[in-house]
């Protein structure tokens, strides 16, 4: 049983698969419909907007009193998460000389993979010690931290 299912079971809810479906559909739709916003508004601005939406979604998942709220939270989280990786990737690659862009993109991808490798056990420990609901609170805090770092990087880039 995955964390999504255990979260639903811990709340006494049914239909956990719908939550993942809503997340996935919103993620894909946002990528398809708004990918051009990165070139239009810039990577930092797009990432800041998306992380803000993602954070709201995670907080809704944390506080959800019913499956309806959880579905809305999952949708917002999927929508928000969709453009963070490509938007920040655009900004990361801007910092690398043209001759090294392939290596720069590889390094960016490695750090994303490293973050995923750390997040799994970390969130597992949160679930084990605090309960499944607190995974979403912890993820929201990390999203706020990422938002703060992105704002800082945007200010530095504009200076």
Where are the regions a protein language model picked out?
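Structural signature of the two symmetry-related core transmembrane helices
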Residues: 45-60, 137-140
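A membrane-interface helix-boundary motif in multi-pass transporters
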Residues: 125-142
């Amino acid at each position: 049983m995955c964390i999504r299912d255990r979260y639903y079971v811990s709340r006494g809810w049914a239909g956990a698969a719908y939550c993942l479906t809503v997340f996935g559909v919103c993620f894909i739709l946002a990528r398809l419909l708004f990918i051009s916003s990165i070139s239009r508004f810039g990577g930092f601005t797009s990432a800041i907007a998306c992380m803000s939406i993602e954070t709201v979604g995670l907080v809704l998942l944390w506080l959800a009193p019913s499956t309806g709220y959880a579905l809305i939270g999952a949708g917002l989280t999927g929508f928000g998460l969709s453009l963070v990786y490509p938007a920040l990737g655009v900004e990361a690659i801007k910092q690398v000389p043209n001759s090294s862009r392939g290596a720069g993109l590889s390094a960016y991808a490695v750090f994303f993979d490293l973050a995923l490798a750390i997040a799994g056990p970390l969130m597992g420990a949160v679930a084990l010690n605090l309960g499944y609901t607190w995974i979403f609170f912890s993820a929201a805090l990390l999203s706020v931290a990422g938002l703060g770092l992105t704002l800082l990087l945007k200010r530095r880039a504009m200076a």
